């Protein structure tokens, strides 16, 4: 594992590469946080993720840690830098299995709306070394993938909570 810059919340506004997308979900903010805390749920909607392992006990909060394994053998050692139940959570990579990641953070902001909630997801990156120019080229494709993940999340939460309501 290679160290990443230990960025704060402001990185999700100032990073060299920012991706911000929004989805409206037909679930409550509480239900969304249930999904975001569920390690089995992440691979179901963010399909680049293969496994999530919480390395801190509940209750989760700022300072909580987890390991996220992704396709291509990439592993991120994450630390939550914000955990405001039902409104916001954000994490950064403290370490990554590739040297290409100089700094990485994600910010999930949740707003209650009529009939559910709105999730605004920001991914912030700073690449290192020769990987830097690659993201400039692949930026549109990455953003398409991120939007697809949010569509997946909507389908996943629709199915998960529709089944719960029928029980």
Curated annotation (Swiss-Prot):
GO cellular component, one term: plasma membrane
InterPro entries documented for this protein: Polyketide_cyclase/dehydratase, START-like_dom_sf
Pfam families per UniProt: Polyketide_cyc2
Superkingdom of origin: Bacteria
Database matches in SUPFAM superfamilies: Bet v1-like (SSF55961)
Protein name in the entry: Uncharacterized protein Rv2574
């Amino acid at each position: 594992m290679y160290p990443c810059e230990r960025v704060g919340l402001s990185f999700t506004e100032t990073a060299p590469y920012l991706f911000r997308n929004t989805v409206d979900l037909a679930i409550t903010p509480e239900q969304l946080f249930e999904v975001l805390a569920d390690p089995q749920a992440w691979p179901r909607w963010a399909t680049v993720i293969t496994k999530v392992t919480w390395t801190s006990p509940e209750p989760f909060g700022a300072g909580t840690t987890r390991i996220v394994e992704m396709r291509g053998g990439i592993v991120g050692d994450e630390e939550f830098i914000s955990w405001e139940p039902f409104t916001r959570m954000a994490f950064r990579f403290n370490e990554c299995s590739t040297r290409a990641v100089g700094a990485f953070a994600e910010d999930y902001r949740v707003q209650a709306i009529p009939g559910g909630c709105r999730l605004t997801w920001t991914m912030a990156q700073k690449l290192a070394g020769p990987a830097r120019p690659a993201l400039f080229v692949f930026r549109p494709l990455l953003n398409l993938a991120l939007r697809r993940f949010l569509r997946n999340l909507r389908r996943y939460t629709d199915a998960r909570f529709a089944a719960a309501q029928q029980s």
